[in-house]
Amino acid sequence: MSWHGHLQLHYRHDPNEDRTVAHDRHHGPLRVLQRLYPEGPSICHHVLVHPPGGIVGGDTLEVDLDLAPGSHALITTPGATRYYRSAGEVARQQVRARLAEGSRLEWLPLETIAYDACIAENSLRFEIAPGAMMMGWDLLALGLPAAGKPWQRGSYLQQLELPGIWLERARIDAADARLLDSPLGWAGQRVLGTFWLAGGDALPKGLSDALIESARALIGDSALAATAGVSAPHANTVVLRVLAPRVEPAMHLLGAIRAAWRSIAWHLDPCVPRIWRT
């Protein structure tokens, strides 16, 4: 039996209380687990959960986000998103977000794991209006090699789109040794992390430079210094990429850079989501 889960989240700013008010509607097993305000009323932390625990062939999960002017949402998950083996059907996740002027979004799900023989598609689209800004990450692990469960069969299609700013579409096949093992590709690593900060306008030159400088300093102090890098591929965004043998060191690096960028760009404390500590 396949599942179709659809979650709609709408955020608006209440100026009387300086509060981000959230409304949600869901169909199927995808829903909000927690709504928290650990930083005060202006920033809403949402924890999304898919109760069946994983996505199998034939399943489709859709998330639609709408951020009104002045709202600020942080969205994460309590655990990894897991694509399990498929008998031939595609498992899909689609995330679509619209950020109005003056809104902020932090898209910070925990890692995605592609299990052996999965056939998966993951599509992320973030429309950012002038005056809005977001930071987000995507962390993909191919199999669980440390547990003796390598990714030997299957495919994974990843699309990440910031219209007018950045479009990336990559199809990864488990049989593509040239991509996965070449020093010009994954270099034998099995975890790829991407972290970005983007605005609806060109980032001020001083801000872009400060973000890159801080990330390079943290990369230089990391065990992943040889497989991580940061650049500004477009005037509106700064992007970091990292390859790692396991999820933990990649997530540690992304978390450190997220804390630095949050302070530099928004003058906010790191505020690690509580669900990550449980």
From Swiss-Prot:
Where it sits in the cell: the answer is: Cytoplasm
- GO: which molecular function terms? nickel cation binding
The source's superkingdom equals Bacteria
Query: What keywords are annotated for this sequence in UniProt?
Result: Chaperone, Cytoplasm, Nickel insertion
Q: Which HAMAP family match?
A: UreD
Quaternary structure and partners? UreD, UreF and UreG form a complex that acts as a GTP-hydrolysis-dependent molecular chaperone, activating the urease apoprotein by helping to assemble the nickel containing metallocenter of UreC. The UreE protein probably delivers the nickel.
According to its UniProt entry, the function of this protein is described as: Required for maturation of urease via the functional incorporation of the urease nickel metallocenter.
- Annotated protein name in UniProt: Urease accessory protein UreD
Q: Which organism is it from?
A: Leptothrix cholodnii (strain ATCC 51168 / LMG 8142 / SP-6)
